[in-house]
Curated annotation (Swiss-Prot):
Gene Ontology molecular function, alphabetical: heme binding; iron ion binding; monooxygenase activity; oxidoreductase activity, acting on paired donors, with incorporation or reduction of molecular oxygen
Similarity comment: Belongs to the cytochrome P450 family.
Membrane association type: Single-pass membrane protein
Note: Trichothecenes are sesquiterpenoid toxins that act by inhibiting protein biosynthesis.
GO CC annotations, alphabetized: membrane
Protein name stated in the entry: Trichothecene C-4 hydroxylase
Species annotation: Trichoderma arundinaceum
Residues the record lists as binding heme: 442
Length: 499
């Protein structure tokens, strides 16, 4: 009996301590925490579960934009997370520095790819990949890319002939995934051929939506176990099928000697295979899969975004269309080189599109060292704090850009940068870094930029576009690390149809 009473008293004592610790923790986080001097939403700081709920609902990034407009350059949005929107923060968080801030990894088991790798392996993977994105590599890959863009234009011409509206998001995705699939695996996903998504691509879209749940699970392990218990078996099977497809396709590419020397990604990655600094077969599979995700969905996203904003800004659309059609004698003249050197206004349009609709709208967290204070954009940040530059908030903040809600490519032209009388002179253009900065910046930036420029230039060369009424508010989207894009319905008028 005495033992039973003792157990009961012990349980009550434990429960009392636990219940008492909640308000104490809230008070500590709000008023005594080393980061308490940085403003932010008190509800999220006191009860960080609400920050996770916002992510799961797909409204986190929109709310972060509001919080930065309310609180300023630095926002503390959970007990140990701080977001910034300044140029200096890009340098302090992501750039080369003596004590490099580590990338925050959701998974406890790192995949052997360039995203999840530690600093040593990341440098090794990057060294193996860089030649593929060099001028020589791009020159070898351009014929492959051009072939898919040719097919892309043919498909749009077929759709145009029907007189019906079409979803440009799908066509951009079909094309970019086919291109990157061929460059990484030696074969396309058949999107342009079959006019539908390959199962691995459909899984990729769904998988990004799960990142918010994984992030919540990292903060609340019990919640993760509950969520995993309710994960649909079909999703798990799709993941396994995707990984099996990647391994099988890479194996087939390795065995196909006819493709050796074609200058694609795998060709370059294989050059040091078996050597100490080279990639083993497991790393080849993981990095090929990563390149496909990173080099396709984001590329299609910016193409979709610039298409929408051009159609919403008729004077800009007219100006860039005239530039494209007057710069070349024929469509064949639109190449990687010419689309970059002869279309300055189109390049400015892309810069403005990246500002309005960055493919990765959120922040990419880094973790401050476990000892000492880290200075970020003038703020003293305590150890083990997750810090980031929130891209959408930074790019849309009035402190960084004059009339930020307007689509104005002129802010990126030389006159705006050098003429003090320009209304855009004081815009903080270095704040816009969609490809990141520092040692983990986008390794495929050169290819992505060339690809999107040629694709858009050829669309504008061939077609007059019209936004369908149902897509008028297309940018009203949720975000789950990437944008949850709906259909971008457009009507295409083939300017050569009657010729």
């Amino acid at each position: 009996m005495a033992n039973a009473i003792s157990v009961g008293v012990a349980v009550q004592l434990v429960l009392t301590v636990l219940l008492a610790s909640i308000p104490l923790r809230v008070i500590w986080n709000l008023f005594f925490h080393p980061l308490s001097y940085i403003p932010g939403p008190r509800l999220w700081i006191a009860f960080p579960i609400f920050r996770q709920i916002a992510s799961i609902r797909g409204v986190f990034d929109a709310q972060m934009c509001e919080y930065h407009r309310k609180y300023g350059n630095a926002v503390r949005f959970s007990p140990n997370e701080v977001s910034f929107i300044t140029e200096q923060a890009w340098r302090d968080i992501y750039d080369h520095r003596p004590n490099q801030l580590e990338r925050f990894i959701l998974s406890t088991t790192r995949r052997p790819d360039i995203f999840d790798a530690n600093e040593i392996d990341h440098a090794r993977y990057r060294k193996a990949m860089l030649p593929a994105f060099s001028p020589k590599g791009l020159q070898e890959q351009e014929p492959i890319v051009r072939g898919y863009i040719d097919t892309f234009i043919e498909r749009l011409r077929e759709v145009s002939a029907t007189g019906e509206s079409t979803d440009m998001v799908k066509w951009y995705n079909f094309t970019t995934f086919d291109i990157i699939g061929d460059l990484a695996f030696g074969e396309s996903f058949g999107g342009l051929r079959n006019r539908e998504y390959h199962f691995t691509i459909s899984f990729t879209f769904e998988a990004f939506k799960l990142l918010s749940y994984l992030e919540a699970g990292a903060a609340y392990p019990l919640l993760l176990k509950i969520l995993m218990a309710f994960t649909p078996q079909s999703l798990i099977e799709a993941r396994d099928k995707k990984e099996e497809h990647a391994e099988t396709t890479v194996r087939k590419r390795l065995d196909n000697r006819a493709l050796h020397g074609r200058g694609d990604f795998m060709d370059y990655l294989l050059r040091n295979r078996g050597e100490k600094q080279g990639l083993n077969d497991k790393e080849l599979v993981a990095n090929a899969s990563t390149l496909i995700t990173a080099g396709s969905e984001t590329t299609a996203t910016i193409l979709s975004g610039i298409t929408y904003w051009l159609l919403q800004t008729p004077n800009v659309l007219q100006k860039v269309t005239e530039e494209v059609r007057s710069a070349f004698q024929s469509e064949a003249d639109i190449t990687f080189t010419s689309a970059t050197s002869q279309l300055p206004y189109m390049l400015a349009c892309f810069q403005e599109a990246f500002r309005h609709y960055p493919p990765v709208p959120t922040g990419m967290p880094r973790v401050t060292p476990s000892h000492g204070i880290t200075k970020i954009s003038g703020y003293d940040i305590s150890p083990n704090t997750k810090v980031s530059v929130h891209q959408l908030a930074a790019y849309s903040h009035p402190d960084n850009f004059h009339r930020p809600r307007e689509f104005v490519p002129e802010r990126w032209l030389p006159d705006a940068k050098t003429n003090p009388s320009s209304p855009w002179y004081n815009d903080r253009r270095e704040t816009v870094q969609p490809f990141n900065v520092g040692p983990r910046n986008c390794v495929g930036r050169n290819l992505a930029e060339q690809e999107i420029r040629v694709m858009l230039a050829r669309v504008l060369w061939n077609f007059d576009l019209e936004l369908a009424p149902e897509s008028k508010n297309w940018t009203d989207q949720k975000t789950h690390f990437l944008w949850e894009k709906g259909a971008l319905m457009c009507k295409l008028h083939d300017r050569f149809a009657s010729k």
